[in-house]
Amino acid sequence: MAATRIEKDSMGPIEVPADQLWGAQTQRSLEHFRISQEKMPVALIHALALTKQAAASVNMDLGLLPQERGEAIIAAAKEVLEGKHPTEFPLAIWQTGSGTQSNMNMNEVLANRGSEILGGVRGSERLIHPNDDVNKSQSSNDVFPTAMHVAAVIALSEHLIPELKILQKTLADKAEAYKDIVKIGRTHLQDATPLTLGQEISGWAAMLTHNLKHIEDSIPHVCELALGGTAVGTGLNTHPEYAVRVAKKLAELTNHSFVTAPNKFEALATCDALVHSHGALKGLAASIMKIANDVRWLASGPRCGIGEISIPENEPGSSIMPGKVNPTQCEAVTMLCAQVMGNDVAINIGGASGNFELNVFRPMVINNFLQSVRLLADGMRSFNEHCAVGIEPNRDRITQLLNESLMLVTALNTHIGYDKAAEIAKKAHKEGLTLKQSAMKLGYLTEAEFDEWVRPEDMVGSLK
């Protein structure tokens, strides 16, 4: 039987594995919430450690925490950030909706490890108290939303936005490279008037430009931190300078523009900042799904589909059909976009379900948010590296389909009118004629007039 030690909390003593740094409240959570396999995200754990580091530093500066205890807490928090205690944070996402148990998990680990750093022991005889020292000037109700925002801003700024910019540039470069390749357009999955391949791809690049702005515009609200609001937003048990100072300290530690929330009641009672920001992520998912679907449709074939572009052939596509290659990057990214959209529904429900002074859907909200960021960042990187950079035009196929399109007849609208142009197109379709043959049979224009007026390369912009 594994060795244990006795830890105590306000509910009494409880056995805890002797080789673990966590304490009584973490152990109770482990025993009471054996639900699924999802654990609190590492990014959130690191954000909690950063929050404790900042709080200890400010509490020392304000004379509220003895120097040696504060320095030990900071040293222990740095160890967590360095990845030295990965097994000490075992709690499920599906716990108290305020994240209290994960806050106490961090408090207990830092208290026990800090005690060891000071030469003491872990357990009830430790030299640092998880509540009185590590959690000084704090409540789970302001710590956990603060850590959520810190984790979200870091994930967006350092992981997602760089990948989004790279993919946008790839598409913008492709748009420029293929700006002179005239192809047929399609609306309603039917033939439409011409455009260039560059123009089509430029639309994809512009979508991502807008997505980037929407995401960046959401970040300032997420940079507002609840820390200093304590239990219900009033700041009970905090120094008057604490809230501003601790936000400034977190900004220094992370190099991100964190500020104290101007209204702590909003910061505790809602998840509005993350609801709004994730809405921008959902918008990005919608754009990426559209782009990936367009790519795989345009690359369909190779002989019996549209086949206007080629994409990299990365791996065999079938266990029974030799030589088959599939648009697997497009399939992977559209699946993850669907997951992000599902995450958004759950986040919306969580955001709408806070009662009175505290939202209690927080662990689910931040888990879904961070999963969406990770999926989108990884998905864009994979799609860019293994698909987008390798998009190439199939010029012969593009020319073939362009010349077969009946919608080139639109160029005649300004010369013979809509009704006669429609008659030409319908006759050509019904009798299997070219547009020129149909127009000449109907006697609406000469061959020379047709050649002068129906020029696909002149149909990709406004009238000159």
Curated annotation (Swiss-Prot):
Single GO BP term: malate metabolic process
Chief location bin: cytoplasm
Annotated metabolic or biological route of this protein: Carbohydrate metabolism; tricarboxylic acid cycle; (S)-malate from fumarate: step 1/1
Keywords: Cytoplasm, Lyase, Tricarboxylic acid cycle
Residues reported in the UniProt entry to bind substrate: 98-100, 126, 129-132, 139-141, 187, 319, 324-326
List of catalytic residues: 188 (proton donor/acceptor), 318
Listed EC numbers: 4.2.1.2
SUPFAM superfamilies given in the database record: L-aspartase-like (SSF48557)
Gene Ontology cellular-component annotations: cytoplasm
NCBIfam families: fumC_II, PRK12273.1
Stated name of the protein: Fumarate hydratase class II
Organism: Photorhabdus laumondii subsp. laumondii (strain DSM 15139 / CIP 105565 / TT01) (Photorhabdus luminescens subsp. laumondii)
Gene: fumC
